[in-house]
């Protein structure tokens, strides 16, 4: 059972500021594979049922930005366009999609802005969403009359005004940004579009999962479960299974 935000306990100095690659590989891939994730602090929620300003109270963790695992539905039964209606408004894509992973993309990052009201006359707000979805996924209609497009996408929600102020503060303080970690060359193909939490066609052996996650933690080592890491990685010597419980990287925005 998922803990409530009040039940979660973190060591002093803990910050959750993962890179795009870490979000896709360590969280989204594992979620779609029904594998344990490093930190159970991302809420499972159909965020398209709510206005963005209601979401922070539903998140397990976050101060200026909040993370959610959410399903994604089709706009039309036989189409591939996602339904972006949400709460009393809608999300509208902005800018170009960003591939995550090289040389072969593992995921896709899309930026969206929330508009209050009905399209095309909605009022633009300061609420931003970064939506991460898996690349190389079969999103064809797999069940008659099913509107499910993705079982899970990972979403980061924040208010643009707060983010701008935080970034300016970091620059003035001379803080260095977190360096992105290079992802693997490939990841197992995932099949989505079912009504289940994990598509039945999806399989992921320990070897494939180890290759997909073959890089060290850079922000949440201290709370990784040693037994789970050892079992998942199958003896991969790159990751130490003896973690210092007090070592937590101080995150930056």
Swiss-Prot record:
UniProt entry tagged with the keyword Nucleus: yes
Reported tissue expression: Expressed in germinating seeds, roots, leaf veins, open flowers and silique stalks.
Swiss-Prot/TrEMBL keywords: Activator, DNA-binding, Nucleus, Stress response, Transcription, Transcription regulation
Domain of life assignment: Eukaryota
Gene3D superfamilies on file: NAC domain (2.170.150.80)
MF GO annotations: DNA-binding transcription activator activity; DNA-binding transcription factor activity; transcription cis-regulatory region binding
InterPro entries: NAC-dom, NAC_dom_sf
This protein's GO CC annotations: nucleus
Induction remarks: By abscisic acid (ABA). Induced by salinity and osmotic stress, and during leaf senescence.
Additional remark text: Plants silencing NAC032 produce abnormally shaped seeds.
Record comment regarding domains: The NAC domain includes a DNA binding domain and a dimerization domain.
Name this protein carries in UniProt: NAC transcription factor 32
Gene transcribed to yield this protein: NAC032
